[in-house]
Regions:
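Active-site/acyl-donor-binding loops of N-acyltransferases
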Residues: 113-132
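Conserved small/polar residues in nucleotide/adenosyl-binding loops
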Residues: 142-149
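Conserved donor-binding loop and adjoining core beta-sheet/short helix segment
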Residues: 29-99
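Short, His- and charge-rich active-site/binding loops that engage polyanionic ligands
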Residues: 137
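Short, glycine/charge-rich beta-strand/loop segments that flank catalytic centers
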Residues: 90-106, 118-121
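Amide-forming acyltransferase catalytic core, primarily the GNAT-like/NAT-type
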Residues: 1-48
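Short acidic (Asp/Glu) patches
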Residues: 77-78, 106-110
Length: 153
C-alpha cells in the first residue's frame, strides 16, 4: 500500500477522486488536505481505484476514512480491513458518516460498531446568523457600550 503525502503535485489526483465525494466534511477537499496534512498527520492512498485518507502515527497508518470514488467502495473497504488484519492493528476509521456506516452494516451486519467522537464534531451555523453575526454579545462589550452612552449625556 503506497501512502502518499498530499502536495501540490498530487492536487489533480485528489481533485479527480474528490469530485465523486457526496459527504459533508470540509476535510474532503484537496485544499484542506494540503493545508492540514502536517498538523493532523494525514496522508492518502488509492485502493481499488478509490481514494482513502489515513492518519499516520510514527510512519504507520492507524486509521482510514471511508473510500471515495466512482466505484463501489466495498472492495476498497475490504482492503482497509485486510491492512489492519495483516498489521495486527485494531481496526479504526474516522469521519464515518451515517450513510457510510449503513453501507458497512449492509455488507457486514453486526460486525462493526460506530462511536461518536464529540471532540471531532463539526459545528453547524445558520447562514443568517453568520451573515448578521447575531447572537449574544460578550458582557464586557455590553458594559462598555452602556458606559459610553452614559458618558455622552
Amino acid at each position: 500500500m503506497d501512502i502518499i503525502r498530499p502536495s501540490i503535485e498530487t492536487k489533480e489526483l485528489l481533485d479527480h477522486y474528490l469530485q465523486y465525494n457526496h459527504y459533508r466534511g470540509c476535510e474532503f477537499s484537496a485544499a484542506n488536505s494540503l493545508f492540514w496534512c502536517d498538523f493532523y498527520q494525514t496522508k492518502f492512498t488509492i485502493l481499488e481505484d478509490m481514494l482513502v485518507f489515513c492518519r499516520v502515527e510514527d510512519g504507520i497508518p492507524t486509521s482510514f476514512t471511508f473510500p471515495i470514488g466512482e466505484h463501489d467502495p466495498k472492495d476498497a473497504f475490504d482492503r482497509v480491513v485486510d491492512y489492519f488484519e495483516q498489521s495486527n492493528l485494531p481496526f479504526a476509521m474516522y469521519m464515518v458518516e451515517p450513510e457510510m456506516f449503513e453501507m458497512i452494516e449492509r455488507w457486514y451486519p453486526g460486525q462493526y460498531q460506530i462511536e461518536y467522537d464529540r471532540d471531532s464534531a463539526d459545528y453547524l451555523y445558520r447562514q443568517e446568523s453568520l451573515a448578521t453575526l447575531a447572537g449574544k454579545k460578550p458582557v464586557s462589550y455590553t458594559h462598555l457600550r452602556a458606559h459610553e452612552t452614559r458618558s455622552n449625556l
